[in-house]
């Protein structure tokens, strides 16, 4: 899944944010 900055994303969901794998929300 892809992520956007703002909310917590599941661990491992860091397609667009490899430097912040726990930041962002799923926008898949």
Swiss-Prot record:
One term of GO molecular function: toxin activity
Keyword Hydrolase among UniProt keywords: yes
Keywords of the record: Hydrolase, Protein synthesis inhibitor, Toxin
Disulfide bonds: none
Catalytic activity: Endohydrolysis of the N-glycosidic bond at one specific adenosine on the 28S rRNA
BP GO annotations: negative regulation of translation
Keyword Hydrolase: yes
Protein's job: Inhibits protein synthesis in animal cells. Does not possess ribonuclease activity.
Stated name of the protein: Ribosome-inactivating protein pleuturegin
Organism per entry: Pleurotus tuber-regium
């Amino acid at each position: 899944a892809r992520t956007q900055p703002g909310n917590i994303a599941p661990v491992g969901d860091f397609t667009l944010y490899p430097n912040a794998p726990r930041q962002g929300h799923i926008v898949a």
